[in-house]
Amino acid sequence: MAAALSGLAVRLSRSAAARSYGVFCKGLTRTLLIFFDLAWRLRINFPYLYIVASMMLNVRLQVHIEIH
């Protein structure tokens, strides 16, 4: 009887874990798709937005290139 109950508990915990993981993956996938869609829409406008914002805030993107 104890073995049957522990087996049932293990099965229930596995299904709950699988269900919560599935919900997590679905939410993550939806979020990534939203960000990819946003990035695709802003692919032309982003450089202009970046230049205007950096001029307004006086912030520069500093890239350090070291050539040997």
UniProtKB/Swiss-Prot annotation:
Family annotation (Pfam families): DUF4560
InterPro entries named among the record's database cross-references: SMIM10
Database matches in PANTHER family: SALIVARY GLAND SPECIFIC PROTEIN SAGSIN1, SMALL INTEGRAL MEMBRANE PROTEIN 10
Protein name: Small integral membrane protein 10-like protein 3
Lineage of source species: Eukaryota, Metazoa, Chordata, Craniata, Vertebrata
